[in-house]
Amino acid sequence: FWASLEPQNRSLNDTEFVLAGNSESLQVLTENAPAPAFYIFNCVEKGGFVIVSGEDTAQPILAYSTTDTFAIDNMPDNIRNWLQAYRTAIQQLRLVDVPLDENTVNLWKSPERTLTQANNSKLIETAKWNQEEPYNLYSPKIVGRRTPTGCVATAMAIIMRYRQWPDIGEGSNRYYANTCEKYLETSFDVNYDWEGMPLEYIEGKYTKEEADKVSMLMYHCGIAAEMDYGLEGSGAVTRTAILNMIKYFKYDKSAYILQRDWYDQETWDNLIRNEVTNESPVMYGGADPDGAHQFIIDGYEGSHFHVNWGWGGLCNGFYLLSALTPEQQGVGGNGSYNQLQDAVMGLKKREENSTYHDILIFFAGLDNGKKYNGLSTNTSTYVTGKTFRMDAAYIGNSSLRDFEGSLVLALVNKNGEVKENISKTILLEETLPLGMGIGYPNIECKITQAIEAGDRIWMMYKSKDASEWYRIVGEKGTVTEIIVKEDDPTAIEQPVDRISFSASCDKQGWLTANLPEGVQRLCIYSVDGRTLRTYIPDSNIEKWGVSCSELPAGIYILQAVTKQENYQCKFVK
C-alpha cells in the first residue's frame, strides 16, 4: 500500500496531505507552528489513509486504512479525542528527551512491515452506521431539531446488529432526561428485524421501512442507556448501558468492563485481541474533561486495531492503542493517553446458569494520614514456615453489581499458577457496594511450600455465586504483587510515584489534595467517567481543598491538568 515513508516520498502525486497534529485544536500546519506530533495523508487515487508520527522516538505508523479516507471536516469528537491522545503521548516523549531504542529504530527502517501483517490479522464486519439521519428519526427534538443518537447508543446498536440479538426485547424503561427537560420512555417488547437493517445506509439506496427499523433500534438503545440527548452530542454512561443490555435485551450477565489503566500495554493489547479472535467486537471507550466517547474495535493487524468510529465509515481504519512502545509507557507518569479508557468484554447472547464476572481492583488512598498503595508487607526476606504480615488496601469494587464473596492471599509461581493460599480466607462480612473501597491491614501469612525463583504473592477474590478465583489487578502506581524470590529483575513491579499527587476526604466531606506543579484545572469524575465538578485553582499552590459533602459515599477520581500532561488519583468519600 505505502511503499516508503522517507521524507522525499511524503508528497507523492497520489497522496493528499490533510492534517498536521501540532496544536491543541489540531489545526492545519502553518509556517510558524511547532513540530507536528503527526501527519495525515489520504491516498486520493485508490482510497485509504496513513497517519505518520512526527517524532522518530515514537512508533512510525500510528494508523492506516487501505479503503476508507480520513476527513477533517466536522470531525467527530471521538476521533478528535483519539488524535489528541496521540499528540499528548508524543509531546511527553519530547519533554523527557527519550533516546531511540532498537525496536523503534527497526520499525522506522521498514515501516511498510506494519501494513503486511497478514499472518496475524482478524477483521469482523460490523455495520457502518451513524448518529444522524436516518438513524435519529426517533430521537427527541430540542428547539425543533432532532438530536443525534449518541455514541453509546450507536455502539450498542452496532454490537446488537452483529449479534442479531435480541429477537424480542423485555420490559420498558422511563427516566428524566435533563437536557430535554422531560421524561423519556419506551417499551422494548418488540421484534427486531435484523435482516431489515442494512450494514450500510447509502443515501437513495435504502427504503423508508429500513430507515424506520434502524432508527427505532437506536432510540431503544438510547432509552436503555438513559441517554442525555443534546444538539451538540448525546451522552450516556457505559455501565448503565451494559446493565440494561442485560436487563432489556437479553445479553449475558457475565459481561464486564475493564479499564486500560489496570494493565501494561502488552497485556491490554492481548485482552482486546483475544476478544476479537473469539468473534466478539469490543465496545471501547475513552474520556477527557470535555466528555466520554464510545466506538467499536472489530479487528486487528499486528499491533494495530481496527476501529469503527460509528460515523458511517468515516476514518475507520487500523489504529495503535498507544503511540508509545511498551518500553516507553512510563514516560511522563500516567499521562492522559490511557486515562479513563475502558473496554466491554463478553457481550453475547444470554446463557443459562451464567454468573456475573465481578471485578475488584487496587487503588491508592490515604487513611488518617497513612498512604495505602495496594499490597505491602513487614518483611523483605521470606522463609518457609515463618509468619509475616501484609496490608491490602484499598480494594475497590468495579463490577456491575455490589460484591459479595471472599479474598485470600496466595503464593503463585512465575507463570501465575497458584501454589498455595498463605492466609486465611477473608469472607466479607458486608456487601462491598459498587464504587466503594475497603482495606485489610495486618493480615497474617505463612508460606509452607518450597520457595522457587519467580514466586510472588497475589491477592485473589471469588464471588459468592462463582467457582473461579481471580487476581486483583490495580491502577498504575499500585503494588499488585510482592516478589518473594527474584527470577528476572525486570519482572519486579515497582510503584510509579513520579510526582507528589494524592487526595483524601475526611468524615465531614472535606477533600484535601497535594498538587503537582503547574496545575491549570482540576476535575472530579465518577468511577464511570462522568465529569462531576471542574475547578480552576490558584496558581503555584501545593495544597488544595474543597467541600464534597453533597457527594454520595463512594470512590471518585481527581484529575489534575497541567500544561504538559494530566494526572489522576482516586479518593474515597
Regions found by a protein language model. Give the residues of each.
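Cys-His-centered catalytic/binding microenvironment captured across papain-like cysteine peptidases
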Residues: 3-19, 26, 32-34, 50, ...
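Active-site-adjacent substructure of cysteine-protease-like catalytic cores
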Residues: 15-18, 23-47, 243, 247-308, ...
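Active-site-adjacent structural segments surrounding the nucleophilic cysteine of cysteine proteases
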Residues: 58-234
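Residue-level detector of functionally pivotal "anchor" positions at catalytic/ligand-binding pockets or at interdomain
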Residues: 341-367, 485-512
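Aromatic sugar-binding surface patches on proteins
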Residues: 428-445, 540-545
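Surface-exposed, short loops/turns at beta-strand junctions within beta-sandwich domains
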Residues: 446-454, 548-553
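Short beta-strand elements
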Residues: 465-489, 571-573
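C-terminal outer-membrane/trafficking sorting elements
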Residues: 493-573
